[in-house]
Amino acid sequence: MRITRDFDVAEECVQDAFAKALASWSQQGIPANPGAWLTTVARRRAIDLGRRRDVAIRSQRLLITDAEMFDREPTAAIEDDRLRLIFTCCHPSLATDTQVALALRMLCGLSTAEVAKAFLVKESAMAARLTRAKKKIAIARIPYRVPERAELRTRIDAVLLVVHLLFTTGHTSPVGEELSQVDLVERSLDLARMLHSLLPDDGEVTGLLALILLTDSRRGSRVGTEGEFLALADQDRSTWHRDSIDEGLVLIGDALRRGRPGPFSLMAAIAAVHSSAPHWDETDWSEIVGLYDLLIDTWPSPVVALNRAVALSFAEGPDAGLRALDELSAEPQLSAYPYLAAARANCLLRLERMSEARDAFAEAAMLTENNVERSYLLSRIEELDERMRVPHDGRHQ
């Protein structure tokens, strides 16, 4: 980006570098520093494209000077190429949501559709947002360079959000045949660990790493032997990854001792309550509701309110949960969100309002684009249909 000043050209150069890597590395082996190899090839491609497009001699000299400056930039603050690029992309001249969306799309490999779902907007709206951001960068000539160590904290909030949304997209894939995208989960965990090594005294950095560890500890328990989705209540907790839980509990304890917790520390604290319960029916739902109350004050969002309503349904009963969920039905961001319909379905089922529960499960199945989730929701509909069938004696069950 520093060389081309154009996101589309930069993306073309990166794709060309990866294509050359596939051809070269298969014959000559992977170089000692793959990231530097790719950067060099992409940079050469950018300079070559500039020459082919008849860039003026003076501009070309500036281009080459920029490339030389890139070579001389200090890298000690952020040693990992991926993390360095994310910090670079999160430029404070752009709105935080735009920084995050660009990083997810351009650096993390998410499709525009996946980025849109992460932000609860339509794909067309996200595509337009990304296009406007690229134009702003080009017109305003926003300088993209690796930030110095002193600048890291001005960008850390956006970087944390990038890593968090990368994890959530991987943890439950918004589209596709698999419940999770393990490569995205592992990439986000690597990035969270590197952030913690870089800023070990930052409570929110610590909280994010704890959140990922505690949530990912359930990875192997979320799908049954036949590939079916297993809800939290149905999981075998003895199969949860104990080392990840132990590490996460230590980290969240450390984060909470640092003073007023931020959103990632609070989400990690909620995950810690789940991880500490030996069985589903021993979950401290009142504590979870209290933590969600703090989270809403710190980071208000419809999704947080939805999760609080679910917790409330177990702390105070399905009636209370359903009332809270119905209050969210007018939220525009949740109009196509399958988990709102699924949460309503579960409350209605517990209230034995079978027909309404069936309709809500059907709505959730229609909205989700994850086939594992859809199969689970359709199985719930089949169970309800069986329960609602008229018995031989003519009485309704």
Regions found by a protein language model. Give the residues of each.
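Short, charged helix-capping/linker segments at alpha-helix termini
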Residues: M1-V14, S24-N33, E123-S124, P174-L179
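Σ70-family region 2.3-2.4 aromatic/basic alpha-helix that recognizes the −10 promoter
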Residues: Q15-L22, A32-R52, A56-R61, K134
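Short alpha-helical "recognition helix" segments of helix-turn-helix
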Residues: V115-K117
